[in-house]
Curated annotation (Swiss-Prot):
A motif (Nuclear localization signal 2 (NLS2)) lies at residues 184-247. Influenza RNA polymerase is composed of three subunits: PB1, PB2 and PA. Interacts (via C-terminus) with PB1 (via N-terminus). It comes from Influenza A virus (strain A/Henry/1936 H1N1). The keyword Hydrolase applies. One of its GO terms (molecular function) is RNA binding. Mn(2+) 1 binds at H41, D108, E119, I120. This is Polymerase acidic protein. InterPro entries: INFV_PA, PA/PA-X, PA/PA-X_sf. Keywords: Cap snatching, Endonuclease, Eukaryotic host gene expression shutoff by virus, Eukaryotic host transcription shutoff by virus, Host cytoplasm, Host gene expression shutoff by virus, Host nucleus, Host-virus interaction, Hydrolase, Inhibition of host RNA polymerase II by virus, Manganese, Metal-binding, Nuclease, Phosphoprotein. Its cofactor is Mn(2+).
Length: 716
């Protein structure tokens, strides 16, 4: 570093830096980063002053080197770089002549035009952090502060930058060059990390020993010590800082910070239009399972064998017919596709040896359902760029849809308990952390609360379907493979159970890129009559395929069995995330853990046991028009899990946008509730950003409706 400094800086600057370090008793052979920092600071001070003069009329003027008119008065007096005695003599002389207030600390420059002292800062960290440290140290409104960073950022008192843009650009370019030169020699990282904050001489409560070490380790990024952080917090005025930042961005930006009051926010505007429809990749609350208990058949565990065994448990099959047609589809083709599945399964049963996989015959109705040969032919751009009217497809704006009650019912159902267990205790993974006892205890309590939850069934169903579909897409790219939709669970008595929900037929799947689409037809059993909520089933063709005998209070009753058929599609990246759905368990466990931690810190002991075993205690579970809903800890666990699962099942750009933008409004409202007097600018723009995500997605519309309930009672 020392060699670099001597090569990079003017010998006069190097000499001054050496003197300064000597004066403060510092060894430049050891403190090489400090040596470089002093040289940089000196150079910036000199560049700040260079070429700036005041003419006889007292006006500021810029004169380049070698100009014959250079007999003008220098605009800036340089104080930095002089020995301390001389520097204070200059400062005293300026104060006597101009009547300026004497500063407590030695400044770097004096500006004869603006009649003020200037403190120059050069930082390797965030400019605003360094600015606030300087301001906190100086504690004088009379000294003007101007901070530069090596990334081209700057900050000055009241955003008054003193110099013209070109002069400041020259300084920024030089700093950037120094950074590049250091980086090319591998010196930058060490230099960047070595910066210490301004030291303020103030009596404070002293923290020492272990607590001091912990405090230093717990600081946010960019803070090198507890003192820096204290200085930053003490001097921070958020609204003024934001206004300053905005005015730095552009001359046109003129943001006024408006106070955010209880009367300020309005509810989100939900779209009008036909009710939204189901868009999940598989049926949720409406799914029906054909099950076998204690499976021990030949080939148990091979999906096709399991599926055939499950199909044999049902005897009420009948000639299928369409009860709810798909508005835009060729419904007879869906009917023929189901018939083909039944016929080909029958063929397998007639064979001596059941195969492990089944590829369907490529019939015309299956080709239609799977979109075979429907995609427009791709042509290389170079072959058609000369065509005059070449244009992209006109795509229609998505039709606005209104919130329908079925999505709230779906969510409520996902929070409920089933009579089966869907995960084993070790599904979340073994602990490796040192606090294993508490971690295991929390995990076991949580698992017992959610193992029977319907949302957990959706996780295991999603993992199975996505894994099977991705495997088939890679292993049988050209085939229309039949994939059973299967899940496994344990009954209350602990018996194993294999369930069949229906079938998927996969289309051609030459998936080169993550976003390339594989089409599939899903055929799922259900007892739900689609004519009760036809809007929910807009994308489906529904067949009646049999009658099922069900036990009820009045004896056995016969109910029609339906098959929900639709064409759908997914991609490698979506299947990859579908396979990772178990993460939802982890996410909701972490949310519960943070609740336990908050409770434990108040009571100053681990509250895990009390948290889960105190059945009389209720916890906030969500918002409704009535206010905050509360429930048992088990219900809280299941609700958090269901939210996480629905975020995965209904993942979409609309959800991403809504979550990111509505969070900003949520934080503002929370700040208001905490009496932090939040200020906002362009609140209308934030509402616009949130509402442009409210189009037709059922889960997003439900979340927006919940958000409105929250706004209503949060601001009472």
């Amino acid at each position: 570093m020392e060699d670099f400094v001597r090569q990079c800086f003017n010998p006069m600057i190097v000499e001054l830096a050496e003197k300064t370090m000597k004066e403060y008793g510092e060894n430049l052979k050891i403190e090489t980063n400090k040596f470089a920092a002093i040289c940089t600071h000196l150079e910036v001070c000199f560049m700040y002053s260079d070429f700036h003069f005041i003419n006889e009329q007292g006006e500021s003027t810029i004169v380049e080197l070698g100009d014959p008119n250079a007999l003008l008065k220098h605009r800036f007096e340089i104080i930095e770089g002089r020995d301390r005695t001389m520097a204070w003599t200059v400062v005293n002389s300026i104060c006597n002549t101009t009547g300026a207030e004497k500063p407590k600390f030695l400044p770097d420059l004096y500006d004869y035009k603006e009649n003020r002292f200037i403190e120059i800062g050069v930082t390797r960290r965030e400019v605003h952090i360094y600015y606030l440290e300087k301001a906190n140290k100086i504690k004088s409104e009379k000294t003007h502060i101007h901070i530069f960073s090596f990334t081209g950022e700057e900050m000055a008192t009241k955003t008054d930058y003193t110099l013209d843009e070109e002069s400041r650009a020259r300084i920024k370019t030089r700093l950037f060059t120094i950074r590049q030169e250091m980086a090319s020699r591998g010196l930058w990282d060490s230099f960047r990390q070595s910066e210490r904050g301004e030291e303020t001489i103030e009596e404070r409560f002293e923290i020492t020993g272990t607590m001091r070490k912990l405090a230093d380790q717990s600081l946010p990024p960019n803070f090198s010590s507890l003192e820096n952080f204290r200085a930053y917090v003490d001097g921070f005025e958020p609204n003024g800082y934001i206004e300053g930042k905005l005015s730095q961005m552009s001359k046109e930006v003129n943001a006024r910070i408006e106070p955010f009051l209880k009367t300020t926010p309005r509810p989100l505007r939900l779209p009008n239009g036909p009710p939204c429809s189901q868009r999940s990749k598989f049926l949720l609350m409406d799914a029906l399972k054909l099950s076998i208990e204690d499976p021990s058949h030949e080939g148990e565990g091979i999906p096709l064998y399991d599926a055939i065994k499950c199909m044999r448990t049902f005897f009420g099959w009948k000639e299928p017919n369409v009860v709810k047609p798909h508005e835009k589809g060729i419904n007879p083709n869906y009917l023929l596709s189901w018939r083909q599945v039944l016929a080909e399964l029958q063929d397998i049963e007639n064979e001596e040896k059941i195969p492990k996989t089944k590829n369907m015959k490529k019939t015309s109705h299956l080709k239609w359902a799977l979109g075979e040969n429907m995609a427009p032919e791709k042509v290389d751009f170079d072959d058609c760029k000369d065509i005059g009217d070449l244009k992209q497809y006109d795509s229609d704006e998505p039709e606005l849809r209104s919130l329908a009650s079925w999505i709230q019912n779906e969510f409520n159902k996902a929070c409920e308990l089933t009579d089966s267990s869907w995960i084993e205790l070790d599904e979340i993974g073994e602990d490796v952390a040192p606090i294993e006892h508490i971690a295991s205890m929390r995990r076991n309590y949580f698992t017992s609360e959610v193992s029977h939850c319907r949302a957990t069934e959706y996780i295991m169903k999603g993992v199975y379907i996505n894994t099977a579909l991705l495997n088939a897409s890679c292993a049988a790219m050209d085939d229309f493979q039949l994939i059973p939709m299967i899940s496994k669970c344990r009954t209350k008595e602990g018996r194993r159970k294999t369930n069949l929900y229906g079938f998927i037929i996969k289309g051609r799947s030459h998936l080169r890129n993550d976003t390339d689409v594989v089409n599939f037809v899903s055929m799922e059993f259900s007892l739900t009559b689609p004519r009760l909520e036809p809007h929910k089933w807009e994308k489906y063709c529904v067949l009646e395929i049999g009658d099922m005998l069900l036990r009820s209070a009045i004896g056995q009753v016969s109910r029609p069995m339906f098959l929900y058929v639709r064409t759908n599609g997914t991609s490698k990246i979506k299947m990859k995330w579908g396979m990772e759905m178990r993460r939802c368990l982890l996410q909701s466990l972490q949310q519960i853990e943070s609740m336990i931690e908050a409770e434990s810190s108040v009571k100053e002991k681990d509250m895990t046991k009390e948290f889960f075993e105190n059945k009389s205690e209720t916890w906030p579970i969500g918002e409704s028009p009535k206010g905050v809903e509360e429930s048992s800890i088990g219900k809280v666990c299941r609700t958090l899990l269901a939210k996480s699962v629905f975020n995965s099942l209904y993942a979409s750009p609309q959800l991403e946008g809504f979550s990111a933008e509505s969070r900003k409004l949520l934080l503002i409202v929370q700040a208001l509730r905490d009496n932090l007097e939040p200020g906002t600018f362009d609140l209308g723009g934030l509402y616009e950003a949130i509402e442009e995500c409210l189009i037709n997605d059922p889960w997003v519309l439900l979340n927006a409706s919940w958000f409105n309930s929250f706004l209503t009672h949060a601001l009472r």
